[in-house]
Amino acid sequence: MVMYPENFGIIGENPELKAMRYSFITVGIWWMSFSQYTFYFLPDQNERKKIIKDVVWNGFKELVEVWNELKKIIIIKKYLIAFFIYSSALQTVLLIAAYFGEQEINWPKDEKTIGLIVSILLIQLIAMFGAIMTSKLSEKFGNIHTLILLNIIWALLCIGGYFITEPIEFYIAAAFVGLIMGGIQALSRSTFSKMIPETDNTTSYFSFYDVSQKVSVVFGMTLFAFVDQITGSMRTSILVFVFIFLIGALLLKRIKIKNY
């Protein structure tokens, strides 16, 4: 719709902008329509629980309690530190990829928008195959070894990103990103699930995992912006994450491989 608005009867001034607005509506209709299946078949929670005023504060207290428990389990503590480090680079690269492509790639006239859309679609499509490939690698070599390998590949991608200037190079990089993006995210989560103790309160543990991931984004984006501000170069900022991924790989190497 955005790439070829005239095929959808969208004409006039700035048809691409109009098409983008319409696309938001169609996506909303898509989610509303297909979510009905879930709403219909999921069991209905009839029990109504009273909303407590201190629910947010209690959530923070629960996270602190989980952290105190996790600190006693050395292997999880080591893993979460490694995860925080490489996740800060991973999430930041994913967030700024489109902006990097817009600012740093020499797109032909009137092809920038289409090129960025194609790149995003390419990443999403290939991510499925990447997740399958990562699953096979983890079965053969173990989760930790596979995560170390993926961190090294990410570091190499960041080095390659420093030299990318042409659209074809950006497409190739996007394909590699898709290949390892879904895999490292899924494998990181499954590795954490293997490490947590047997408990009925797994939700709290994964809540802490998710909070760690969100905080890592803040750290990564702050680091990226700081380097970009000092050097005036987005490419130099990308190079910083080479070291972040390598540090993540080294921290993962400290974890005993048994059962992981």
Name what the model sees in each region.
Residues W30-F41, I184, T236-Y260:
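Multi-pass alpha-helical transporter architecture, strongest
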